[in-house]
UniProtKB/Swiss-Prot annotation:
Protein name as it appears in the record: Cobalt transport protein CbiM
Keyword Protein biosynthesis: no
Membrane topology field: Multi-pass membrane protein
Cystine connections: none
The organism of origin for this protein: Anoxybacillus flavithermus (strain DSM 21510 / WK1)
UniProt subcellular location: Cell membrane
Pfam family, one: CbiM
Subunit: Forms an energy-coupling factor (ECF) transporter complex composed of an ATP-binding protein (A component, CbiO), a transmembrane protein (T component, CbiQ) and 2 possible substrate-capture proteins (S components, CbiM and CbiN) of unknown stoichimetry.
Pathway in which the depicted protein is active: Cofactor biosynthesis; adenosylcobalamin biosynthesis
TM region positions: 33-53, 70-90, 102-122, 134-154, 168-188, 208-228
Length: 250
């Protein structure tokens, strides 16, 4: 059971390093110092409660179910890899998948908040993608809103009898799109359009992101289904443990 997980996690980290060390344009994360300090503070304050709950959940998970550590590492590596696959955008910045849907479905949205924040902090400090002052805003969109959307949508799909594969696809895809809708809102609030205000600015940012992000979201959804099927083939024991704890949904 553990060898396939170790292989995937190792492959994910290797691919991530290759992409991370390659030259690239600015990442989609809001860069350091870009937001006015007032808005940077607001997003930090909104993000922190989710992070603290997530830290508590991670500590409890590791204490009660240490067997799932490798699965947690896999979810982290999956997020690292997908968020490193940067594609140039029409704005001169870049778009990328988020990879938060899988972890949210396995461990719940709050544990995924911690994983996503770790990814963002690593990128900010070592790769100059995003920033420390804007970490609250970036984490709120990618590590809070995205996982919550994935978890809630997956729950609703299963409640209404949608197949697991379709549910996973929709959850991962919408987690990606929700992240960039939130980012568009953040930028629009900080930099409203001179004539059309916040709504006009939001439409501009969202339409620019949509050019690359919609295809990426669909691709991420399909890839998440592939990984989900792999886990259900080779890691049934770990998934059963999570299901018994109530962290994952069948």
């Amino acid at each position: 059971m553990k060898k396939p997980l170790f292989f995937i996690a190792s492959a994910c980290v290797t691919i991530y390093i290759l992409f991370a060390l390659s030259p690239s344009v600015y990442a989609m994360h809001i860069m350091e110092g870009f937001l006015p300090w007032q808005w940077a503070l607001v997003w930090w304050l909104l993000f922190l409660p989710f992070f603290l709950v997530g830290m508590r959940n991670v500590a409890r998970l590791m204490r009660q179910r240490p067997e799932v550590k490798l699965l947690l590492a896999l979810a982290t590596a999956f997020t690292f890899v997908l968020s490193a696959l940067k594609i140039p955008s029409v704005t001169g910045s870049s778009s990328h998948p988020t990879g938060t849907g899988l972890g949210a479905l396995l461990f719940g949205p709050f544990v995924m908040t911690v994983i996503g924040t770790a990814v963002l902090l690593f990128q900010a400090l070592l790769l100059a993608h995003g920033g420390v002052t804007t970490l609250g805003a970036n984490a709120f969109s990618m590590a809070v809103v995205g996982p919550l959307v994935a978890y809630v949508l997956f729950s609703l799909c299963k409640k209404f009898g949608v197949s697991t594969r379709v549910s996973v696809f929709l959850a991962a895809m919408m987690a990606d799109l929700a992240t960039y809708v939130m980012t568009s809102i953040q930028l629009a609030l900080a930099f409203p359009d001179a004539t059309s205000g916040v709504w006009g600015a939001f439409l501009k940012f969202a339409s620019i992101f949509a050019v690359t992000q919609i295809p990426l979201a669909i691709t991420e959804g399909l890839l998440t289904v592939v990984v989900w099927n792999f886990l259900h083939t080779y890691s049934k024991r770990e998934l059963t443990i999570l299901q018994q704890k109530g962290a994952t949904i069948e």
